[in-house]
């Protein structure tokens, strides 16, 4: 039985989610929660090694999905599940919704295969709250171009990101009980006001 809460941050590259992750962590700390901040792919020593491979090496789309879930299984076993059992609040920069969006939407991998992997790797674990930061593709691209050297996903064409974004929004419609879609074109102050209200709701 888990006693902590599991929050995930999602969105296409350039959506601005990482800007607000630390803000939510700080809000929870103010509420006297013990917070574990982590990311996918990654979160463990093995996961971080797989992250480097996944972000920079070309591979078959099924290999990519399998490695994502391999890193996730280790992440759950070593970080997420123990933290929740302790009563901690876990905030993860991406989780399984990202695999459905990027590998399912962007790469066109059969959704049934992803469903099977999800049921194998974490049949009883879902986020309590998923914050989906949504922006138009041109805004996301402009933000990416202004930042840093891009990884292989960030270098994908507009069609890839359109399909990835569409799958994210489909997931949000499928699981409205845990998703909040955040309009990430607004000011940081406006977004943080919304996040403050959402956090208050989940911690009520």
Swiss-Prot record:
PANTHER family: THYMIDYLATE KINASE, UMP-CMP KINASE 2, MITOCHONDRIAL. HAMAP family: Thymidylate_kinase (MF_00165). Its EC number is 2.7.4.9. SUPFAM superfamilies: P-loop containing nucleoside triphosphate hydrolases. One of its GO terms (cellular component) is cytosol. GO terms for molecular function: ATP binding; dTMP kinase activity. CDD domains: TMPK. Pfam families: Thymidylate_kin (PF02223). Phosphorylation of dTMP to form dTDP in both de novo and salvage pathways of dTTP synthesis. InterPro entries: P-loop_NTPase, Thymidylate_kin-like_dom, Thymidylate_kinase. ATP binds at residues 11-18. This is Thymidylate kinase. The keyword Repeat does not apply. NCBIfam families: DTMP_kinase. Belongs to the thymidylate kinase family. It catalyses: dTMP + ATP = dTDP + ADP. GO terms for biological process: dTDP biosynthetic process; dTTP biosynthetic process; dUDP biosynthetic process. Transmembrane segments: none annotated. It is an enzyme of class 2 (transferase). Keywords: ATP-binding, Kinase, Nucleotide biosynthesis, Nucleotide-binding, Transferase. The lineage of its organism: Bacteria, Pseudomonadati, Pseudomonadota, Betaproteobacteria, Burkholderiales. It comes from the Bacteria.
């Amino acid at each position: 039985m888990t006693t902590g809460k599991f929050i995930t941050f999602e969105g296409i590259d350039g959506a601005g989610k990482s800007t607000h992750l630390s803000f939510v962590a700080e809000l929870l700390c103010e509420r006297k929660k013990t917070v574990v901040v982590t990311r996918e792919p990654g979160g463990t020593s093995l996961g971080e090694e797989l992250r480097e491979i996944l972000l920079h090496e070309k591979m078959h789309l099924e290999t990519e999905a399998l490695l994502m879930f391999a890193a996730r299984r280790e992440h759950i076993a070593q970080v997420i599940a123990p933290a929740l059992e302790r009563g901690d609040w876990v905030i993860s920069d991406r989780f399984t919704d990202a695999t459905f969006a990027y590998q399912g939407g962007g790469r066109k991998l059969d959704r049934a295969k992803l469903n099977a992997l999800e049921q194998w790797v974490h049949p009883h674990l879902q986020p309590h709250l998923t914050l989906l930061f949504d922006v138009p593709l041109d805004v996301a691209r402009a933000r990416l171009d202004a930042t840093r050297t891009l990884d292989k996903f960030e270098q994908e064409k507009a069609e890839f990101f359109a399909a990835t974004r569409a799958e994210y929004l489909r997931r949000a419609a499928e699981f409205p009980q845990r998703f909040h879609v955040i309009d990430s074109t607004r000011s940081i102050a406006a977004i943080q006001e919304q996040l403050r209200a959402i956090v208050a709701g989940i911690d009520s």
